[in-house]
Design a protein with these regions (language model features):
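Terminal cytosolic tails of multi-pass membrane transporters
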Residues: 364-386, 407-461
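Membrane-helix boundary/coupling elements in multi-pass transport proteins
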Residues: 54, 77-92, 197-202, 263-303, ...
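C-terminal membrane-solvent junction of multi-pass transporters and transport-like membrane proteins
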Residues: 1, 173, 305-309, 357-406
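TM-loop-TM module centered on a large, flexible mid-protein loop between adjacent transmembrane helices
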Residues: 60-61, 67, 99-103, 219-284, ...
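Helix-loop-helix junctions that connect adjacent transmembrane segments
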Residues: 27-28, 104-110, 138-270
Length: 461
């Protein structure tokens, strides 16, 4: 489910060409670098599951390590960031669906209609619980990774444009101008993998399955992304791939598919990109619902949202709210005549990506603070070291992302400042809410982070 959230086919066909256009043949290495950073973070992240039981993930972990004020602020930021990512991608999904239907059937359907249909499908699957959602996403994930592997194998079997070579992994390629900007895209490609912890209460044997799923997801994405992008370098040749990507960002993968596999595979890939984005939407919908449920359970949001479905046991009330919010935003953008890609996807996704990486940095700090405060330095030495390293690595990634934000938005300085600043505004609002609860509703404040049933939690923060 967490790999489906990252939408491998959408990330590769939709975003990797831009990474190649900016960074050239060294772009595949950026995905490995991001994967290594997230692997270190995953070690620290999983070290906290024993202390929190995985309830609320970022929300609980940060509360346990840095206190309830930071915890609630992070919980609010997580809900808003995931919603921004998920609702923004409906714009991309609508564009992809429109193009696929137009290419195959010759029918022109307005993008808001397609987005609203997708919202209904996501609501239906999410409502039926993790088992149905996981099986459905598993099928879609197999199809989208399968078509990418077909392309990569065909390229390698035919020897690429000028033979198979490995200049991608040379220092000249890795440290080429533009590679710092490529890292922003590479880190964004891993969005959602940390949501494994949100399913702890619904998983079988969570002490083993959750860490295993997290490490497997990070490792698979890092190697798979690097391999596929490297294969595209072979398809066009190291000397020409950057120019080819710059000239034809949208169709780079489709052109390679037509050349090395055939037009039939190109049609299949255009349809699977739609299902790839749909799978991502379902996975993010489920993550949002569980964050909302955790906050409502603790009284930080209306308690009506902590109700589960009587049959499927999914957080259905939270799912209903998320669905309504998505529909309202899509309708508003549609009525305003906004562009679904440049004005919906980019405007909403940018603060979402910044917010999630910021939360990962804060979580890394929380791991370090918790183990030091509880004197677990010796017992959790690996988790502590991983927390320090991931704070540094992800902190640098966040700085690179903000410094190169124009590559994601193609907007001016003022607009970019507003988008990045909105992340800070949400966090400050969360701090304000926590301070209000501490002063006026102490019982609710005591419940923040789910720490009211944790015998090891501090009651003073």
């Amino acid at each position: 489910m967490v790999i489906a959230a990252a939408a491998p086919l959408t990330v590769m066909a939709g975003v990797a060409p831009l990474a190649l256009a900016i960074g050239g043949v060294g772009a595949p290495v950026a995905y490995l670098a991001a994967g290594i950073s997230f692997a270190v973070f995953a070690v620290a992240f999983m070290a906290m599951t024993r202390a929190t039981g995985g309830k609320g993930a970022f929300y609980s972990y940060i509360t346990l390590g840095l206190g309830r004020v930071a915890g609630l602020a992070s919980g609010f930021l997580a809900v808003v960031s995931y919603n921004a990512l998920q609702i923004g991608v409906y714009g991309l999904l609508a564009v992809q669906t429109h193009d696929a239907i137009s290419r195959v059937l010759g029918v022109d359907i307005p993008w808001p209609v397609l987005a609203l249909v997708a919202i209904a499908i996501v609501w239906f699957v999410g409502r039926r619980g993790i088992d149905v959602g996981a099986r459905f996403l598993g099928v879609l994930l197999a199809l989208e990774t399968g078509i990418l592997l077909v392309l990569a194998v065909a390229i390698l079997v035919k020897g690429g444009a000028h033979g198979i070579e490995f200049s991608t992994f040379t220092p000249k390629a890795i440290f080429a101008p533009g590679m710092a900007g490529v890292l922003a895209f590479a880190f964004a490609a891993f969005m959602g993998f940390e949501s494994t912890a949100l399913y702890r209460s619904e998983a079988r044997d969570p002490d083993r399955s959750i860490p295993r799923a997290t490490y497997w997801a990070v490792g698979f994405m890092a190697i798979f992304y690097c391999f596929i992008v490297w294969a595209i370098v072979q398809a066009f040749g190291a000397a020409h791939v950057q120019q080819a990507a710059g000239d034809d960002v949208a169709d780079l993968f489709f052109s390679a598919m037509t050349t090395y596999v055939g037009s039939w595979a190109t049609d299949v890939m255009s349809l699977l990109i739609v299902t790839s984005a749909l799978a991502s939407q379902i996975a993010f919908h489920n993550a949002i619902n569980r964050y909302t449920y955790a906050l409502a359970r603790d009284g930080a949001l209306p308690r009506i949202l902590d109700r589960t479905h009587p049959v499927y046991k999914s957080p259905s009330r939270a799912g209903n709210l998320q669905t309504i919010l998505a529909a309202v935003v899509i309708a508003a953008f549609g009525l305003a005549g906004a562009d679904p890609y440049y004005q919906l996807l980019l405007v909403l996704n940018t603060p979402g990506i910044v917010g999630i990486i910021a939360l990962q940095v804060i979580t890394s700090l929380a791991v370090v603070a918790y183990f030091v405060r509880k004197h677990y330095v010796r017992a959790e030495r690996v988790g502590l070291i991983a927390g320090v390293l991931s704070t540094i690595l992800l902190g640098l990634a966040l700085l690179l992302l903000v410094a190169n934000i124009k590559l994601l938005t193609n907007m001016g300085t003022a607009a970019n400042a507003a988008l990045v600043g909105s992340v800070g505004v949400v966090f400050l609002l969360g701090i304000g809410a926590a301070l209000y609860f501490r002063a006026r509703v102490p019982r609710t404040y005591a419940r923040i982070g789910g720490l009211y049933d944790d015998p090891h939690a501090s009651t003073e923060r």
